[in-house]
Structures are given as C-alpha cells and as structure tokens.
Amino acid sequence: MPIPAPHGGKLQDLVIRDSSIRSDLFKEIADKKYKTLTLSPRQLCDLELILNGGFSPLTGFLNEEDYNSVVHDMRLSSVKNEKNGKGLLWSMPITLDVGQEFAGKLSKGEKIVLKDLRDEKPLALLTVETVYKPNKQTEAEKVFRGDPEHPAIKYLFETAQEFYVGGSIQGLDYPTHYDYIPFRKTPTELREEFSKLGWDQQKVVAFQTRNPMHRAHRELTVRAANDLGSDGHILIHPVVGLTKPGDIDHHTRVRVYQQILKKYPDGLATLSLLPLAMRMGGDREAMWHSLIRMNYGVDHFIVGRDHAGPGSNSKGVDFYGPYDAQELLAKYKDELEPKIKVVPFRMVTYLPDEDRYAPIDTIDTSKVNTANISGTELRQRLRDGTEIPGWFSYPEVVKVLRESNPPRSKQGFAIVIDSSDSKQGEYLSFALQSTLNQFSGERRITKLSSEQATPFIVNELVKSGSGVIVPTKSNQSDIIKAVGSGNSIIVNFNGEQNADQGIFSLKEDLTSVIGEIVEYLVSQGFYQQS
C-alpha cells in the first residue's frame, strides 16, 4: 500500500529555506530586539518535531482553545476531520510554559525568539496568539489520570512554569545534533528513504522503544512484518529525546540498535531515531505515538502491553492497565485507519527444549518449559559480570551493554565525608586514599578538596571508574544524589551508623572505621576478596 498521507493531510515543514526571507527575518530580529526565550530540554524536543512535521498538523504551540480541547476531548478545535466534522484527533497537549514575569510582558501579535539552550542559537519566531494560565490539576487528571507520583504530573507541578504561550511558528533552523546524524531522519527524509528502498508501495510496521533490544524484540518484529505478508518491512524507531528517568542513555541504546539491525534479513528493516520528549502517558501517549508515526510515513504500528506506561507508584499500583493503550486505539480505529493500523504486541518467550522463540499465547506454559530474563535480572547480571546467555541476547549487544554498564569491580564510587571537623576529615581522607591505593586493579583513588567537589565533577569521576574521596561541609546530599546511593559511602562524625547501607560514623577509632569501609566495598563487589 502507498505511504499514508500525514495526519491532517499536509506534512508541515516550518523551517524557512528561502535565503531572502531568512535574511529579512534575521534582520527583523536584530532591528526590533524581540524578547527571547531559551527553551528547556522538553520544549526543545517539542519544537524540533513541530518544525519538521513530526507533530503535523500542528504549526506551533497550542493556543488556549486548542489546549482545552485536547485536554478534555483529545481533539484539536482549530483543525477538523473532513469525514466526521469533529476536531482532528490529538491526544497530548504540546505547550510552551513560561514564568509569570515573562508572561506578563507579552501581548497578542508579539513575536518571541525561541533559542536553543545549548548554544543560544535562534531556532524560531513564535507569534503570540494567547497567553493563559492552565488548570494544571485538570490537565493532570484528564491527561495523566491524576496520580501525583506519575512522572508527567511531577513535571507539571515541579518543573513546568505557571503560564502557557500559544502561537504559530516560523522556523529558522533545527536544533543541531552531533551524534548519529545518518539515523536522525525527519518525516520528509524518512518518506524519501522508503521510496528509495522500494517500500513506498509496501507495508511498514514501526517499533517504538526506549530500551535496548534483544533476541525477543528481533523475533517479535520479524513476526509482525511477516504477518503483513511478503511486502512487510520494519522501521525500528526508538526515542532518543527525553524518556523515563533512570532509563539507559541513548548513546548506549543506539549502539545496541546498530548491532541488532545487522541481525535482520537483508532489506527487511531500517533504523531511524525519534527526538521525542516522552510523557509516559500510557493510552493517550500510544495515540500520540500512532499519529506521529503516520507523519513519518508508516502504515502499521506495534502497540505493546502497558505501552508508554511508567510502571507503578510507591504503593505498587499500576498507573495504567496492561491493555489500556490497545483499547483506546481500538475505540478510534475508524479515524486512524486506513492511514495507520495498530498491531498488538505479541509477547514471545524462549523454549529451551526446542531452541526457539514462540508467541506466549500459542503455547501451554504448564506443559512446555520456557525461559526469560527480566530487566531486573539483566541489570544484576551486568552489575555482577555474570553470563548473559546467547539465547537471550546477541554477543555484540551484550558487549555494548557491558561497556556502558561495567561490573561493580570496574565501577567507581564516592566516599563522602562530613567534614564539620575539617582537620579530622582531611586526615581520614588521606588515610583512606593510602589504604585503598594499596589494592591492585585499574581504579584510581582521587582525593578532592571541599571546593573541588561539585556534584558534577564527583559524578564524572565516578562514571569514569575512579574512587573519589570527598570531604565536604555542605553539599553532601547533592553529591550522593548525583552519584547514586549504590555507589556512595557516607562517613559522618558522631552521627548515625548503618554499615549495611554504607553509612559509617567516626565514633570508633580511625583504623576500625577504615576497616569497616574496606569490608563494605568488598561486600558490594567493588573489590575482590584477597
């Protein structure tokens, strides 16, 4: 089947390329001294997809009327569906949040220069249509179901500012990327690639992921393509913008995707990266992802169990049901098809007795041996340096993961000393450095002064595999937050002690405390027992 038309019928491409118009715009910016707004990481991701058409039919950040319509009805008020006369489907509010002081200086029709936070490069001009204060509680409840622990709701109340600015965009340039350029394709570029590959009259199923891929993912995507017939193909389309806090970094993941791409039959799959800021919005996010893939020229989209869900809250309650996303998309099937069809994710499992994968819904697990490795177990195996079996993942993928997730024996750590007694703290630092340097291995032991020990510097040293000794008076908690509690040891003077959690007190003599710290480092795998 031919490449589907974009959502709304027109693929937006808002970057102005005419040299004379661009010259006039930059002169206008210089002459009129427009207000400037430096974008946050999420706003930057959103702007890129507005500019390149990934968010078609949007031509800017939502004005108040469109925002309210999306929040309450999952539809745009300004763009109509030609078939039913209703607002066009759009499930996620794309908003530009600003502070009260900045908002108070804006007026309708005014232009704002939007800048990249990394290099201050002007990316776009926004013409103000509306400046409004959203009801964040309503947004939280309608869009994300209201649980205050939901990461998008935490962002809404803890990070997003009080006012939203809606308006249309004139694009000056895309944000600059320096990594994986061949894989960063815009919707226009990806559609052109499909034509070059001869896929423009065939079927393409997109696979969305924010995690590394293993053998099971390769198996399920190949099955999805085969189910489409002899003309089925696969787009591996991972998110490399903002994902869930704690996810594996995109550099590691892209290296994994490059390796696993080689494991597909020739001509079956291609890889492109999506600079999306995920909201982890479950069913609404699945709808959003489907519309985005339509704009990228895909006609089938795999929607998995708990698609784009953030898991469960601190009480163990899931934010979304396992099939909420599939059910919502089925409800709007008539408006999505024939442009894009949802392919329900068929979970596969390994059958060790037969050395093959099979869809779990086709076997009787009470009669057949199955094997699987959970994400938690995989992380533990990486941390311990234990074997990851070949039936689970490819050696090339495991190698990439081990490079980015070394075992504890090669990881760095920080010993954070509460140096309220500066002389004793300095002496303990010296004693620890001397003690730890006597052990064999590649790990360097670095002692920083309180002035040198910013959270960023300590974390960078720990990430490089160093042991860092940090006497500090004020920013102890910030350093531990940056490094992570699993790689931190705390030493305080006359305070609490919990050796099992890496917290030590100098109530005892210095030699005993150093011995306990060394014992703890050995027990956690940072050093091998001699």
From Swiss-Prot:
One of its GO terms (molecular function) is sulfate adenylyltransferase (ATP) activity. Its EC number is 2.7.7.4. The active site is at residues 209-211. It catalyses: sulfate + ATP + H(+) = adenosine 5'-phosphosulfate + diphosphate. It is found in: Cytoplasm. Residues 179-410 are annotated as: Catalytic. One of its GO terms (biological process) is sulfate assimilation via adenylyl sulfate reduction. Sulfate binds at residues 208, 210, 308. It is an enzyme of class 2 (transferase). Residues 1-178 are annotated as: N-terminal. Residues 411-530 are annotated as: Required for oligomerization. Its main location: cytoplasm. ATP binds at residues 208-211, 304-307, 348. Keywords: Amino-acid biosynthesis, ATP-binding, Cysteine biosynthesis, Cytoplasm, Methionine biosynthesis, Nucleotide-binding, Nucleotidyltransferase, Transferase. SUPFAM superfamilies: Nucleotidylyl transferase (SSF52374), P-loop containing nucleoside triphosphate hydrolases (SSF52540), PUA domain-like (SSF88697). It holds the Pfam family ATP-sulfurylase. The record marks 214, 217 as: Transition state stabilizer. Pathway: Sulfur metabolism; hydrogen sulfide biosynthesis; sulfite from sulfate: step 1/3. GO terms for cellular component: cytoplasm. Catalyzes the first intracellular reaction of sulfate assimilation, forming adenosine-5'-phosphosulfate (APS) from inorganic sulfate and ATP. Plays an important role in sulfate activation as a component of the biosynthesis pathway of sulfur-containing amino acids. The oligomerization domain is distantly related to APS kinases, but it is not functional and does not bind APS. It is required for oligomerization of the enzyme, although the oligomerization state has no effect on the catalytic activity of the enzyme. Belongs to the sulfate adenylyltransferase family. Homohexamer. Dimer of trimers. This is Sulfate adenylyltransferase. It comes from Debaryomyces hansenii (strain ATCC 36239 / CBS 767 / BCRC 21394 / JCM 1990 / NBRC 0083 / IGC 2968) (Yeast). The gene is MET3.
